[in-house]
Curated annotation (Swiss-Prot):
Annotated source species: Cronobacter sakazakii (strain ATCC BAA-894)
Gene: rplC
Keyword DNA-binding: no
Protein purpose: One of the primary rRNA binding proteins, it binds directly near the 3'-end of the 23S rRNA, where it nucleates assembly of the 50S subunit.
One Pfam family per UniProt: Ribosomal_L3
This protein's name: Large ribosomal subunit protein uL3
Domain of life of the source: Bacteria
Upper lineage: Bacteria, Pseudomonadati, Pseudomonadota, Gammaproteobacteria, Enterobacterales
Amino acid sequence: MIGLVGKKVGMTRIFTEEGVSIPVTVIEVEANRVTQVKDLANDGYRAVQVTTGAKKANRVTKPEAGHFAKAGVEAGRGLWEFRLADGEEYTVGQSISVELFAEVKKVDVTGTSKGKGFAGTVKRWNFRTQDATHGNSLSHRVPGSIGQNQTPGKVFKGKKMAGQLGNERVTVQSLDVVRVDAERNLLLVKGAVPGATGSDLIVKPAVKA
């Protein structure tokens, strides 16, 4: 089963009949329009390419305009691709709604996390801070030793150090689907998802469900 592309609206909460509060993220999943269907003969694999939303005409490049025109769909804000399982069939120009998830219990949500800029090891990797007093001079939040010895005489790759934090692709797995509102194109999932309000999200049926 393929996934869909949506937009993060924000977080709220809903109550069950027993009065239990459930924190939910609201994802707006407008109709995903099929722009291309890839097959084994031409592309070496089976996949469906979709777009969603809209883009100003003066923002659409000529190659993009030709691609959308060939598919006979309105230019969207991007292009995304999902691999097709055996037996799944879609046609170019087809519209796929949030009702795709009507029978799905859990989903995986992929997005781009909020960028935090250049961060130190305490914020980025949860390092302990060093002594606040007792002879500590200007080394309260420094990482400490990062090296080895004359052998191997280098810092190993992957060493946790200061650097860019956030603004990377993140997937949160197995979130419960709380509600599917096909009338308003909304999907409510339990818990938080990556990214800022208004950012694009890829929602797929959970691989570990």
